[in-house]
């Protein structure tokens, strides 16, 4: 009697031993002899059902393959690029003459590839917040390529985002970090100076190593330095260039040149750390040390939001206030020269009326008790109605305050005179300034006798003209 032994990975039983072996003999398995053993099927007892099913499947496959147009439904190629890929790789015998134009791609220019193929097919919304596509593309590409191993390519470690004040550079960076799931290691300009020489440079290395440790543990991270140039740059003759400024610039240069070999004082080892992309923001990188911002170390990105970007950001600012989209567009177009931060301040200014009403209702003396030492907690205001007319009114008020700051130079007039200069010029022009002093405003001055003891005393006179008469 022959025994049936199951083989590794086989679903059928082993064939019977017909060579006169004993009943206790076992058949060697393919798992024992290795994967190179050929498995022989028993052809003496063919299975009619198995053969029939295999024949049917083969017939079905042949029937499916007969459709010569089936590949068109899955064809994602582009004719222009297919022609260019084949250029120089196909024998000229199978191509038309050189001047026929059949193997010349019509739209093979760099502009076609960069504009037609490089589309921002990324979700640039984080909740209700708008992320500028160009801004997100720059940060995502910079962070991604710093984690890739690109052969024979020197990738700048630092990305410098610079531009005008209040344009949302830091906030846009934070939105991109949140979109990527990155919790960056944060630094600010205030940490780049210290009473102890060398402390800021050491702190930069520590923060960089912290980010590298997070990356080594499998969590994406980056180093984010906010407002670099106030802490490491020269802001004219009003600031002093210290040893810490020099060491901060030198440390960033060294890290950019050796991103995987950042050592801490007292911890010198040859084990490479993870590469950490660095993103810095600022308003004017010309104040920084020139070798730091060269192309091999820092990639510069000038951020100037377009009209579409400004409308997108402002739509997120006023979304909770249910301001219609067409009103947001009109508001942005009404103040074209203002920064994005201007519209955030404009929204906050609308709440002044609500706060003023609450202060009048509780009394000025009870404000501290209601806000700090109250069981009920601070008051909760209902969202005021933000109409386009109200927003335009408060926006013009903010613009007038900006013009006052630019026009009035009180520091120059502080010692020369006691007048306010042109501080009230806009109010005077509008007729809303009531304290019209004669020495500040060019108004006609009433002349007459200003002596109360005189016979012809004129109480309305503001300047004595010498016409006083007296009773002797």
Swiss-Prot record:
Residues 452-465 have a biased composition (Basic and acidic residues). Signal peptide: none annotated. InterPro entries: ATPase_AAA_core, P-loop_NTPase, RCA-like, RuBisCO_activase_AAA_helical. This is Ribulose bisphosphate carboxylase/oxygenase activase, chloroplastic. Residues 448-472 are annotated as: Disordered. GO terms for cellular component: chloroplast stroma; thylakoid. Keywords: ATP-binding, Chloroplast, Nucleotide-binding, Plastid, Transit peptide. The keyword ATP-binding applies. It is found in: Plastid, Chloroplast stroma. GO terms for molecular function: ATP binding; ATP hydrolysis activity; ribulose-1,5-bisphosphate carboxylase/oxygenase activator activity. Residues 1-58 form a transit peptide. Disulfide bonds: none annotated. It holds the Pfam family RuBisCO_activase_AAA_helical. PANTHER family: PTHR32429, RIBULOSE BISPHOSPHATE CARBOXYLASE_OXYGENASE ACTIVASE, CHLOROPLASTIC. The keyword Chloroplast applies. ATP binds at residues 163-170. Belongs to the RuBisCO activase family. Activation of RuBisCO (ribulose-1,5-bisphosphate carboxylase/oxygenase; EC 4.1.1.39) involves the ATP-dependent carboxylation of the epsilon-amino group of lysine leading to a carbamate structure. SUPFAM superfamilies: P-loop containing nucleoside triphosphate hydrolases (SSF52540).
């Amino acid at each position: 009697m022959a025994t049936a032994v199951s083989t590794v990975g086989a679903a059928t039983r082993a064939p019977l031993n017909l060579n006169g072996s004993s009943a206790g003999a076992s058949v060697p398995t393919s798992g024992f002899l290795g994967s190179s053993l050929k498995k022989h099927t028993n052809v003496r007892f063919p299975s009619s059902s198995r053969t029939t099913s295999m024949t049917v499947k083969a017939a079905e496959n042949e029937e499916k393959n007969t459709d010569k147009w089936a590949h068109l439904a899955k064809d994602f190629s582009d004719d222009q690029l297919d022609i260019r890929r084949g250029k120089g790789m196909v024998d000229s015998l199978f191509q038309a003459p050189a001047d026929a134009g059949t193997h010349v791609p019509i739209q093979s220019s760099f502009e076609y590839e960069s504009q037609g193929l490089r589309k921002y097919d990324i979700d640039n919304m984080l909740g209700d917040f708008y992320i500028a596509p160009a801004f997100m593309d720059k940060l995502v590409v910079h962070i991604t390529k710093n984690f890739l191993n690109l052969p024979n390519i020197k990738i700048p470690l630092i990305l410098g985002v610079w531009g005008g004040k209040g344009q949302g550079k830091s906030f846009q960076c934070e939105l991109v970090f949140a979109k990527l799931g990155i919790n960056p290691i944060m630094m600010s300009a205030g940490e780049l100076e210290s009473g102890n020489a060398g402390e800021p440079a050491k702190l930069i290395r520590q923060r960089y190593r912290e980010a590298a440790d997070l990356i080594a543990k499998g969590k994406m991270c980056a180093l984010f330095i906010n407002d670099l140039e106030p802490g490491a740059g020269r802001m004219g003759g009003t600031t002093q260039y210290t040893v810490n400024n020099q060491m901060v610039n030198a440390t960033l240069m060294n890290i950019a040149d050796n991103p995987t070999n950042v050592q801490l004082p007292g911890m010198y080892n040859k084990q490479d750390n993870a590469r950490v992309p660095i993103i810095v923001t600022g308003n004017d990188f010309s104040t920084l040390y020139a070798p730091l911002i060269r192309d091999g170390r820092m990639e510069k990105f000038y951020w100037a939001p377009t009209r579409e970007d400004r409308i997108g950001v402002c739509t997120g600012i006023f979304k909770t206030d249910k301001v219609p989209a067409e009103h947001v567009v009109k508001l942005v177009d009404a103040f074209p020269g203002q920064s994005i931060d201007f519209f955030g301040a404009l929204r906050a200014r609308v709440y002044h009326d609500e706060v003023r009403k609450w202060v009048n209702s509780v009394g000025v003396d009870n404000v501290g008790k209601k806000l700090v030492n109250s069981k009920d907690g601070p008051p909760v205001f209902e969202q005021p109605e933000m109409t386009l007319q109200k927003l335009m009114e408060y926006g013009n008020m903010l613009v007038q305050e900006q013009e006052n700051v630019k026009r009035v130079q009180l520091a120059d007039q502080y010692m020369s005179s006691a007048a306010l200069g042109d501080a009230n010029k806009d109010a005077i022009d509008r007729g809303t300034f009531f304290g019209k002093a004669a020495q500040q405003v060019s108004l006609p001055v009433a002349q007459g006798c200003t002596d109360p003891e005189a016979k012809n005393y004129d109480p309305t006179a503001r300047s004595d003209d010498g016409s006083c008469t007296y009773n002797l």
